[in-house]
């Protein structure tokens, strides 16, 4: 499988899909964001449970409930985006800065994000997403939600 990088046509198409997906999150438009998913999407999100997929997939109502937990738009800034793509499969990783007022407090969180995409009927769709934060390895089992990129 040949991996294509450096603003290839496929990478440009993928970036367009991702930008529209992220804008759906920022503007709290569940239909727009979810239109970029495969029908069998599997997600490892920050929120429980351990896995979303199959009969336990995140639905439109769950997405809207999360969106509506924010007052106003959601800050969803993507940093250090890296994409690798073949003609039909791609993956990307980045850091995400999530911010806003999530009732009743401010949210200011950096987390890691990795996703896999598949080209289906000529369109790039998100097939898998994985969000994570590191944990302090001091025995506290506390998530390191205070970290910021250097």
Each predicted region: which residue ranges?
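A solvent-exposed, acidic/Ser-Thr-rich amphipathic alpha-helical stretch
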Residues: 12, 30-87
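A short, structured loop/turn motif at beta-sheet edges
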Residues: 83-90, 105, 117-125
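Short, low-complexity N-terminal intrinsically disordered segments enriched in polar/charged residues
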Residues: 1-40, 144-150
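Short, cysteine-centered beta-strand-loop-beta hairpins and adjacent loop/turn segments enriched
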Residues: 99-108
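Hydrophobic/aromatic beta-strand elements that line small-molecule binding cavities or substrate pockets
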Residues: 63, 78-83, 96-98, 112-118, ...
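Short, well-ordered beta-strand segments in beta-rich or mixed alpha/beta enzyme
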Residues: 21, 33, 42-46, 90-100, ...
């Amino acid at each position: 499988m040949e991996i294509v990088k450096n603003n290839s046509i496929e990478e440009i198409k993928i970036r367009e899909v991702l930008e529209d997906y992220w804008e759906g999150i920022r503007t709290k438009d569940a239909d727009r964001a979810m239109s970029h998913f495969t029908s069998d999407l599997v997600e490892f999100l920050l929120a429980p449970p351990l896995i979303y997929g199959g009969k336990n997939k995140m639905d439109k109502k769950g997405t809207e409930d999360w969106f509506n937990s924010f007052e106003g738009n959601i800050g969803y800034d993507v940093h250090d985006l890296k994409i690798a793509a073949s003609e039909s499969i791609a993956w990307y990783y980045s850091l995400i800065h999530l911010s806003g007022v999530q009732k009743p407090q401010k949210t200011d969180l950096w987390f890691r994000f990795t996703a896999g995409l598949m080209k289906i009927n000529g369109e790039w769709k998100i097939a898998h997403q994985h969000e994570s934060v590191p944990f302090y390895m001091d025995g506290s089992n506390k998530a390191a939600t205070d970290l910021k990129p250097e």
